[in-house]
Amino acid sequence: MKFSDSCAACMYDRQCAKTDNADYLKKIKDILDNRPADITSSELVMQFNELHEKYIGPLDDLSAEKKEYNDLVLSMEDDIRKDIEASVDPLATSIIMARSGNYIDFAALDSVDKETFIGLFDNTKMSETEMEVYDSFCRQCSKAKSFLLLTDNCGEIVLDKLMLEQLKKRFPNLEITVMVRGADIYNDATLEDAKYVGLDTLGTIITNGRRMAGTVYKMLPDKAKSVIDNSDIIFAKGQANYESFAGEGHHAFYTFLCKCDLFINRFNVPKLTGMFVEE
């Protein structure tokens, strides 16, 4: 996905709100002003984080928040599973509910609160446009042998697990692989988190090999590239995966909540509107 001048301005403003360290902010501005045309936000954030550790100190430790939301959604798991299985189309419902978990994003949102998160479960219906994408998704899954899930946040991955349960029920021949982050970055899910919530019971877990929020194909280890290249279906969660992976030459389905102005304006929807797209 093309990185725009408005994204650059937003990223710089967010750094200014975080610190008044003049040397750090000058370096950030230099990176943004001289960025390559094809760079992704995920790559820029990696550079920012390296500078943060050099000029300011370690990045915020969100391990407590990660565990808090993993535990919160795990405590809701049985009730959510019952709601999914009682619905007219459990797979469709599970996709919408898994997307609701995309709200748990301490990088994109200034604040995350449990009431807003829980309120997102009130609407589990797909729009007419989303149903067209869903029909395409099901048609392709019925013919596929391999399925790759690109995950995003902690807490959200519990809902991803419930989605994968329904996927395996509908399409039992699918071989499932789940890709998580290669190291702690914000509240994104890692291998440890995936095992903690039980995602490893539904598929093979691999990592993107980096401390990177997103999926930048050219920066992935060979194993991750091979899995992407050989997966019949790629299902990517969250804004960061869309920003870094869409338009890079691989067909994929994406679902996310629109949390920043770029997505709100691109899709012309209110904040926190869910999207299900195929590209």
Please annotate each region the language model reported:
Residues 146-148, 232-233:
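Structural motif
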Residues 136-140, 150, 163-166, 223, ...:
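Short, hydrophobic/aromatic alpha-helical segments in well-folded domains
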Residues 176-193:
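Short connector loops at secondary-structure junctions
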Residues 2-144:
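Electropositive, gly/pro-rich neighborhoods at or near active sites that engage anionic ligands
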Residues 180-181, 194-279:
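C-terminal functional extensions of proteins
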Residues 153-172, 177:
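Histidine-anchored nucleotide/phosphate-binding helix
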Residues 145-146, 173-177, 251:
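Residues at the starts of beta-strands that form the adenosine-phosphate
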Residues 152-161, 183-185, 239-243:
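Gly/Ser/Thr-rich loops at beta-strand to alpha-helix junctions
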